Amino acid sequence: MKVVIQRVSQASVTIDSKIVAKIQKGLLILVGIEDSDNQEDINWLSSKIINLRIFEDKNEVMNLSVKDINGEIIVVSQFTLQALTKKGNRPSYIKASKPEIAIPLYQSFVSQLETELGKKVQTGIFGADMKVSLINDGPVTIIIDSKNKE
């Protein structure tokens, strides 16, 4: 499971000209799921994200987590994070899970984030053509791959 985490001052997801998710200060998380992902990946990754200290404290040191600041989260599925670009110029998405595998894992990931954050997590709609808007705060953008634990 690969994620791109962006610290935002606000973010939203629009589908067919309708805003389906919107947050203020918090995290926008893009998630790409592969066939070998499982609950262990979800548990490790959600704990890492919730406890990641990327928000500034009163001394302007990145020492606070999204939970510490009572921040919000939007999660957006993005199979293109699993792109393979080694051969040629057209990315291959063969590593990306098919919806029948990815959707339950995606839902479990969102549910685990909600449990650890202690509140509802906003989401896009899996597989939809989404317009994602954000104001990146910092900018702070972090990429994590659960397979490498980094």
From Swiss-Prot:
Annotated motif Gly-cisPro motif, important for rejection of L-amino acids: location in the chain? 138-139
State the GO CC annotations: cytoplasm
Q: Which reaction does it catalyse?
A: glycyl-tRNA(Ala) + H2O = tRNA(Ala) + glycine + H(+); a D-aminoacyl-tRNA + H2O = a tRNA + a D-alpha-amino acid + H(+)
Q: What subcellular locations does the record give? A: Cytoplasm
One term of GO molecular function: D-tyrosyl-tRNA(Tyr) deacylase activity
One biological process term from GO is: D-amino acid catabolic process
Give the highest taxon in the source lineage: Bacteria
Annotated keywords:
Cytoplasm, Hydrolase, RNA-binding, tRNA-binding
Listed Pfam families: Tyr_Deacylase
Q: What is its EC number?
A: 3.1.1.96
The record, for NCBIfam families, names: D-aminoacyl-tRNA deacylase
**Quaternary state and interactors:** Homodimer.
Cross-referenced HAMAP family, in alphabetical order?
Deacylase_Dtd (MF_00518)
The domain comment in this protein's record states: A Gly-cisPro motif from one monomer fits into the active site of the other monomer to allow specific chiral rejection of L-amino acids.
Which PANTHER family does this one have?
D-AMINOACYL-TRNA DEACYLASE 1, D-TYROSYL-TRNA TYR DEACYLASE
Give the function comment from the record: An aminoacyl-tRNA editing enzyme that deacylates mischarged D-aminoacyl-tRNAs. Also deacylates mischarged glycyl-tRNA(Ala), protecting cells against glycine mischarging by AlaRS. Acts via tRNA-based rather than protein-based catalysis; rejects L-amino acids rather than detecting D-amino acids in the active site. By recycling D-aminoacyl-tRNA to D-amino acids and free tRNA molecules, this enzyme counteracts the toxicity associated with the formation of D-aminoacyl-tRNA entities in vivo and helps enforce protein L-homochirality.
Q: Which family does the record assign?
A: Belongs to the DTD family.
Q: What is this protein called?
A: D-aminoacyl-tRNA deacylase
Q: Tell me the name of the encoding gene.
A: dtd
